[in-house]
Swiss-Prot record:
Protein name (Swiss-Prot/TrEMBL): Uncharacterized protein L320
Organism: Acanthamoeba polyphaga mimivirus
Alphabetical list of Pfam families matching this protein: Methyltransf_15
InterPro entries referenced in this protein's UniProt entry, alphabetically: DNA_methylase_N6_adenine_CS, RNA_cap_Gua-N2-MeTrfase, SAM-dependent_MTases_sf
Alphabetical list of PROSITE patterns matching this protein: N6_MTASE
MF term (GO), any: RNA cap trimethylguanosine synthase activity
Amino acid sequence: MIIMDYYHMDIILYPNKNLQKSLTKRKCLKQPNIHSIKRLIFPPITETRLSKIMIDDESIKYITYNSSAQEITNIIMNNLENFPCPSHCSEEKWRLKSPDQRMKKLVITEMTAGVGGNVLNFAKYFKYVNAIELNCIRYKYLNNNIKLYDYSNVNCYNDNSVSLLIEKDDLGQDIVFFDPPWGGGGYKQFQNLRLDFDKYSVEVVCQKLLEKNHNKMVILKLPSNYDFDYFFDQLKSYTINKFDIEKMTIIVVKKY
């Protein structure tokens, strides 16, 4: 019998059938089935395609589950009421568009794409999605997962997102989303956590992004114990909205 160790993806062979049966039962009780985990994480898809979804252990720990990804998209949509008219639209037509119609005219860039937790939801609603992932393996998984959902409006980049968007300013978008690493499980011990992303603080990343003329909104996914007083003070020249959802806080920073 072959037993799959879900957490490390190791194959273990046991010659004793009784031992096999006992261990199999124990593992079934303790370990979630990888197929069931994928079903929770990713948007609805056929069982055949779901089995082809690629994800690594680290991503399972930190990925945005589908239900939360939808909540984040809804938050962005609800903040589009006063969003400036893009250059490719007429002011009159823009004013008449509903938030979901406006979203279909906008481009969002995900700076921390991973294997697609938020990207796959964004692709359903936005005109285009730029998905940036630095890790080569996750970049491969990201491309695979996007293809399984038949999305043709996602451009993937295996690169440093800070370099692309801030130092080079190579990509064009209306909205930027990023989920900076929270520092592992130890982040929970802090009362007023502050985070860096690449070589900048999270606050400086927001400032530098919003200095670019084409970026009108920046959305962040942060832990609930973040130092929000500091964040609000550093970005007080912008409009900031804070939304608490399960186990995380979504911050919307607007320059309009």
